[in-house]
Regions:
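Short pre-active-site segment immediately N-terminal to redox-active cysteine/selenocysteine motifs
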Residues: 60-62, 67-70, 135
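Conserved redox-active cysteine motifs that mediate thiol-disulfide chemistry
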Residues: 66-80
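Conserved helix-turn-beta segment immediately C-terminal to the redox Cys motif
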Residues: 60-61, 76-97, 111
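Thiol-/selenol-based redox modules, centered on thioredoxin-like
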Residues: 141-172
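Short, internal strand/loop/helix patches
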Residues: 95, 107-145
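N-terminal targeting signals for export/organelle localization
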Residues: 1-41, 161-165, 172
Length: 172
């Protein structure tokens, strides 16, 4: 009995450790662009009907956010963003892109948070596919010259705050 408990404990620890390593490994493996690289350019249709290229934003710091309207982490992150935008003027561009979703679902999401940032739709995930293969929310911080200066995968308040602070430093 004593050996059975020990065996079960070892198996449990091994499985838990494997899950943790796999998660971070798959985050890395699913990220197609890295810090220090030029952000891939794209054209996206915004909810207001305009079309914008990422390269149109050169000269400005950009926080590029990929989201899904059904993702609970995305909702938590946008609650955080809405709060920050109410507390202070945001001196950098926020470009959010809903991947694989309809205009209607994305518009409802934007209205829930009173978002005033540019919000685009990527119904076939082709833009998202330039940056990653899975996991949202995913945030890329892009400097005024188009280089990726930081990124986060999924939502962690501490990691997002760190990236937000870095964005504020880039515009100073």
């Amino acid at each position: 009995m004593k050996y059975l408990r020990l065996f079960i404990a070892i198996i449990a620890v091994t499985l838990f450790e494997g899950c943790v390593k796999d998660e971070h490994s798959s985050h890395d493996e699913s990220t197609l662009v890295r810090t220090g690289q030029i952000a891939p350019d794209f054209s996206v249709e915004l909810l207001d009907g305009r079309e914008i290229n990422l390269s149109d934003l050169r000269g400005r710091t950009v926080m590029l956010i990929f989201l899904s309207t059904t993702c609970t982490d995305c909702h938590a992150q946008f609650e955080d963003i809405a709060r920050r935008c109410k507390e202070q003027s945001v001196p950098f561009e926020i470009l959010a892109i809903s991947r694989g979703e309809s205009r209607e679902a994305t518009l409802e999401f934007a209205n829930n948070y009173g978002l005033e940032c540019d919000l685009g739709i990527d119904p076939d995930k082709s833009i998202y596919g330039m940056y990653a293969t899975m996991y949202v929310p995913r945030v890329f911080l892009i400097d005024s010259e188009g280089y990726i200066k930081g990124l986060t995968v999924e939502y962690s308040p501490a990691e997002f705050d760190s990236l937000w602070q870095k964005a504020l430093q880039l515009v100073r």
